[in-house]
Amino acid sequence: MGRILLVEDEYNVRVLLEHVLIDAGYEVDSAATVAEAKSLLDSVHYDLLLADGRLPDGTGMMLADQAEESGIKALIITGYAFQLAELGRYEFLMKPVRPAELVGAIERILGAPAC
């Protein structure tokens, strides 16, 4: 089982993604802002950061940079096509994300199913 930090500012999207990830067998912590996520990244070990590309106080790429320094893999989800060029070295999915597509991408990045 992998542990995922989910960072999504839209409450309904965050709750939906949490359920998808938990149903797939992952342990999930969530945050709505970069500040909340940084606090969690500093205190808990995660296997994957799943972050929205645009957040109220920064970007998912900022968080991915911090996560990468700690050996944590990152997957960015975005609804903004113009952001794709900024993503560069990070894996990404376009919103809206289908549950099977999300779980498949996570399994590919982590190298194994959750359970």
What annotation goes with each model-predicted range?
Residues 8:
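Conserved acidic carboxylate
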Residues 11-29:
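Two-component/phosphorelay signaling modules centered on CheY-like receiver
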Residues 30-48:
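Acidic, metal-coordinating helix/loop segments flanking the phosphotransfer/catalytic sites
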Residues 33, 59-62:
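Acidic catalytic/metal-coordinating carboxylates
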Residues 52:
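Active-site residues of response regulator receiver
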Residues 56:
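The feature encodes the CheY-like receiver
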Residues 72-78:
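Hydrophobic/aromatic residues positioned on beta-strands within the core alpha/beta folds
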Residues 84, 97-115:
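C-terminal output helix
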